[in-house]
Swiss-Prot record:
PROSITE patterns according to UniProt: ATPASE_ALPHA_BETA
Protein's name in the database: ATP synthase subunit beta, chloroplastic
Gene3D superfamilies: 2.40.10.170, Bovine Mitochondrial F1-atpase, Atp Synthase Beta Chain, Chain D, domain 3, P-loop containing nucleotide triphosphate hydrolases
GO MF annotations in UniProt: ATP binding; ATP hydrolysis activity; proton-transporting ATP synthase activity, rotational mechanism
Keywords in alphabetical order: ATP synthesis, ATP-binding, CF(1), Chloroplast, Hydrogen ion transport, Ion transport, Membrane, Nucleotide-binding, Plastid, Thylakoid, Translocase, Transport
Membrane topology: Peripheral membrane protein
SUPFAM superfamilies, per database record: C-terminal domain of alpha and beta subunits of F1 ATP synthase (SSF47917), N-terminal domain of alpha and beta subunits of F1 ATP synthase (SSF50615), P-loop containing nucleoside triphosphate hydrolases (SSF52540)
Species assigned in the record: Anthoceros angustus (Hornwort)
Recorded family membership: Belongs to the ATPase alpha/beta chains family.
Catalytic activity: ATP + H2O + 4 H(+)(in) = ADP + phosphate + 5 H(+)(out)
Subunit composition and interactions: F-type ATPases have 2 components, CF(1) - the catalytic core - and CF(0) - the membrane proton channel. CF(1) has five subunits: alpha(3), beta(3), gamma(1), delta(1), epsilon(1). CF(0) has four main subunits: a(1), b(1), b'(1) and c(9-12).
Amino acid sequence: MKTNYLILGVSTLISKNVGHISQIIGPVLDVTFPPGKMPNIYNSLIVRGQNPAGQEINVTCEVQQLLGNNKVRAVAMSATDGLTRGMKVTDTGAPLSVPVGEVTLGRIFNVLGEPVDNLGAIDVSTTFPIHRSAPAFTQLDTKLSIFETGIKVVDLLAPYRRGGKIGLFGGAGVGKTVLIMELINNIAKAHGGVSVFGGVGERTREGNDLYMEMKESKVINEQDISESKVALVYGQMNEPPGARMRVGLTALTMAEYFRDVNKQDVLLFIDNIFRFVQAGSEVSALLGRMPSAVGYQPTLSTEMGSLQERITSTKEGSITSIQAVYVPADDLTDPAPATTFAHLDATTVLSRGLAAKGIYPAVDPLDSTSTMLQPWIVGEEHYETAQGVKQTLQRYKELQDIIAILGLDELSEEDRLTVARARKIERFLSQPFFVAEVFTGSPGKYVSLIETIKGFQMILAGELDGLPEQAFYLVGNIDEVTAKAETLQMES
């Protein structure tokens, strides 16, 4: 692919420092420069030339180490096939820069900020370097506020913090992608915000599927691309470790522009944060650093911190991040997930059991947690309602073994009432999504936090004990439950 030098923050490569490749070890290059002409750490270098077959080569690298004797060690952002010793390397004199702003919406980019969706070039008049400092303390917004998503189970039981970081846990086929798309849709409608999706080291097929589903659900508008609500940045499994290590920063940089310049609320999705750590581990080994615990890089905490600290609320806007977390061998004490947990404000756990029952979103109400669910943050009413819902569901879980063996009739009157209410709560936690309208045929619902609390209070208080369970399934607020119950009664 032809490299756009404007994207790299360089208008011309004439009069730049030029060196030559002295060693190639996979994706790592050693480059020798003339004395006194050494590039800085994180500067991007460009290797141009022709391979033995006569094809053009254009490889961008990032300086990682200064080795002495006028040598630097750099990591390639694309495949190093066809590179040979002695090839000329040009120092651009600046870190890698990527395009930012409205031009990125509805498009797919690689780590270098080049469009890879075959929809033509984009305007690159505004670029940001991918290595930036976290906002200063004086710019931070320290007020704790809830980020309302319009999804009942999330807002009530594991509320997101505005400018916070949320871990999304779930296996294959339980609805992670649909939940992500609904959040992208809701932030655009309710908050006037935009989203950036960073695909870090995941399957190319999944990235393609997500793009197709976003077009189908109109999150990406093919007819008018400027009406799209999301920018996509992909550095998938087949990319070299340098690209996978930096693609998260490319996505974050695009999100920072919307927060700092456009003063918007931004959702940043990173799928998968573990692959960011994994790529860093590969690069660390290639650079010859001594590995730390379990073979991870010694700079694990620093690398994670430099990414996570840039994700925050300022007085201008906010970046709320939702990060899919892969847990290797289901070991939560592994250094990669353990380091990630230190930064998270909430966890959303998707349950295969709920998905099997047809309850979507399949968010586990008992396993999902949030640091925001405190009475002095969300208020006494919200806190008490959430605790009541959790207690009822927990009691139902404890009684399930007895019900399976002896049947419902053997329970006490009080327990039978608890089970009936718990089953209604379980169904009321389901909700039709806007982005799933094309599959389900039922219109999506955005439920405000006030309506959510009111609905669950009425169920817990026994005001709706007379309504059938089916009336609570896949509806929005409590008024729709009573309307659905009347319809069911008329039909029967």
